[in-house]
């Protein structure tokens, strides 16, 4: 049987959201017996590379990587921003993107979408963003991302000694890369979220915060800078001895992530995000029965609406001028802003309900 020559282009070897999405698409492509799959690897901002030869998927990507784009590809899957797509890379070209986490996108992206044979997005939210800006909705398909299959295996965990060393038995979990240099430009809204937590549980020795984060890389220098930044944020919030804030930095394996989400000391996942194209960590946490407190807007509603979660109220607000780059984030576009005080209110409210049975909250076992 003659196989089709298929290429996937994107940040396949990076520790990033797009990198994870790339590898999900790659796994599906190599499962097809009728595809001869090649890889064109690109960077993703300043994110770290994953070059672990013992990881079978990483090894397979490296083995299939090519440098020459001028090959007679039959199909291309380009997991990138729309302006990075090449509509002439193959005979049939499919763009895969989470676009941008605002209510509309760069108008130039509309033409980029219309030039591709098909566009795949991870959520109805992302599709709406593109369509609201003028893209052809008939050319855009929604295919959701997925949590790791290994999460469904009961014994598939790897102990994180970090958690065993934490003295607080009730902890909120925040995951996310710090994506902006100030409180106004950080898309994940981590600055305000940490402040709300510290203020809500000031002087409370029974509750802690586990903050899994970085500034873009999993290096020692990045860790030092990250710890320094978080300490300054906590200090600005007027923290005393309590609550305890625990910083978790560096790459985690799928087994370690499962251990983190399902650990008895982790009581809630908290995100006051301003916008998500999909929100994979939210799905991962929910798949393990971890209760979620999240902004009631953007990509994660596709799956969180299938069950129940604590919805943080929001107002659509124009993005701050320090976030505007007129390439990805456009002037006068809007994202969600959780009103001051809302996060703290819900944090205090849910201290009482931390004993909820996880089994009743497993809402996202998507097949």
Model-derived features: positions:
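Short hydrophobic beta-strand element within catalytic cores of glycosyltransferases
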Residues: 291-294, 310-311
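Donor nucleotide-sugar binding/catalytic pocket of nucleotide-sugar-dependent glycosyltransferases
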Residues: 117-128, 136-155, 312
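Conserved catalytic-core segment of nucleotide-activated headgroup transferases in glycan assembly
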Residues: 21-23, 28, 150-256
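Extended catalytic core of nucleotide-activated donor transferases of GT-like folds
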Residues: 7-9, 46-131
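Conserved donor-nucleotide binding/catalytic region of nucleotide-linked donor-dependent transferases
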Residues: 340, 348-366
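Acidic donor-binding loop of glycosyltransferase active sites
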Residues: 259-277, 287-290
């Amino acid at each position: 049987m003659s196989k089709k020559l298929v290429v996937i282009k994107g940040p396949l070897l990076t520790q990033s959201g797009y990198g994870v999405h790339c590898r999900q698409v790659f796994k599906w492509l190599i499962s097809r017996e009728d595809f001869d799959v090649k890889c064109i690897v690109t960077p993703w901002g300043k994110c770290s590379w994953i070059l672990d030869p013992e990881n079978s998927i990483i090894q397979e990507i490296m083995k299939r990587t090519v440098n020459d784009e001028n090959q007679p590809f039959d199909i291309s899957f380009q997991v990138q921003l729309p302006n990075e797509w090449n509509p002439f890379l193959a005979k049939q070209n499919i763009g895969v993107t989470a676009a941008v986490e605002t209510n509309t996108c760069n108008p130039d992206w509309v033409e980029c979408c219309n030039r591709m044979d098909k566009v795949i997005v991870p959520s109805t939210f992302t599709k709406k963003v593109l369509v609201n800006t003028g893209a052809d909705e008939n050319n855009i398909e929604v295919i959701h991302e997925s949590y790791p299959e290994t999460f469904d295996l009961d014994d598939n965990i790897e102990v994180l000694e970090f958690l065993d060393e934490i003295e607080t038995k009730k902890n909120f979990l925040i995951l996310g890369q710090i994506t902006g240099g100030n409180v106004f430009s950080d898309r994940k809204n981590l600055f305000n979220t940490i402040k709300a937590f510290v203020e809500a549980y000031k002087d409370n020795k029974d509750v802690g915060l586990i903050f899994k984060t970085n500034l873009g890389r999993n290096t020692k220098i990045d860790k030092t800078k990250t710890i320094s930044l978080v300490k300054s944020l906590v200090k600005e919030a007027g923290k005393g001895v309590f609550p305890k804030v625990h910083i978790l930095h560096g790459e985690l394996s799928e087994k370690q992530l499962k251990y983190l989400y399902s650990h008895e000391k982790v009581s809630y996942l908290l995100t006051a995000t301003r916008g998500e194209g999909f929100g994979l960590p939210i799905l991962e946490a929910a798949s393990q029965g971890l209760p979620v407190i999240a902004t009631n807007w953007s990509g994660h509603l596709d799956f969180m609406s299938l069950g129940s979660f604590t919805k943080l109220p929001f107002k659509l607000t124009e993005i701050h001028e320090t976030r505007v780059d007129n390439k990805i984030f456009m002037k006068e576009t809007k994202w969600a802003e959780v009103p001051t005080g809302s996060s703290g209110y819900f944090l205090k409210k849910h201290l009482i309900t931390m004993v909820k049975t996880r089994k009743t909250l497993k809402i996202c076992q998507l097949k």
